[in-house]
Amino acid sequence: LNVRGNLLIGELAEKLDFPFKRNGSLVLCLDEKDYPNLQKLYEKGITNGVKKLRILNHDEVLEMEPNVSENVYAALYAPTGGIVCPFNMTIAFAENACVNGVEFRFDTEVLNISRISSGTENWKIETTSGTYETKCIINAAGVYADRFHNMVSEKKIHIIPRKGEYCLLDKSAGSHVSHTVFALPGKFGKGVLVTPTVHGNLLIGPTAQDIENKEGTNTTRDGLDQV
């Protein structure tokens, strides 16, 4: 799906009028002993159908991005990588959905979900703005997805939110890198990245911290120091 979406995003950006730039991405390998992991990442990308992947040596990386560490050993280069503004893109998708008949119910809390057998409908959704019956439900509630899952499933789950903090730098720093630069992924994710934004800023982050408060979006001094 990532590969398919990557192929479609340029056309969607043009049709729906949201900013998109195919700036390419680099995954850096800073130590020779980690090179086999970079090779595995390359092979996984080829298996998944990512086009034009290649591994760059030390000199090629520094020629492409002079501001990365002199200690860089190699990097995986994906010229198909790109950046968007997620806020503009989401609003554009919502506007397009509305034009095509989707109805939004804002300020509406789901109180309960239950199975029914009423004609062609399978589910009843009780909310603060009324009751709805539908054939299917897509649970896209993010960190609250466990709440709705547990309304209908005997196998209960509990989502532990993981908070990530970013540092958004001024546009005067936006030219420090031209590609999206990743570290080699670890077992908990991609780690901290450095990327230009479509608006000309420089974005660094995120951290990764397990929290209990599902609405804990505050930033911290420790998070900034880590970034």
Where are these regions (language model features)?
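A structural signal for short hydrophobic beta-strand segments in well-ordered beta-sheet cores
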Residues: 28, 110-116, 194-196
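Short beta-strand to alpha-helix junction loop
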Residues: 3, 28-37, 76-95, 105, ...
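Dinucleotide-binding Rossmann-like beta1-alpha1 core, especially the glycine-rich loop
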Residues: 1-64, 191-192
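Helical element adjacent to the flavin cofactor pocket in flavoenzyme catalytic cores
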Residues: 76-136, 144
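Active-site substrate-recognition segment that forms the wall
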Residues: 7, 16-20, 131-132, 141-227
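General beta-strand structural signal in soluble alpha/beta enzymes
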Residues: 54-57, 104-106, 139, 204
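A short, glycine/Asx- and small/polar-enriched loop/turn
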Residues: 33-36, 64-72, 114-124, 174
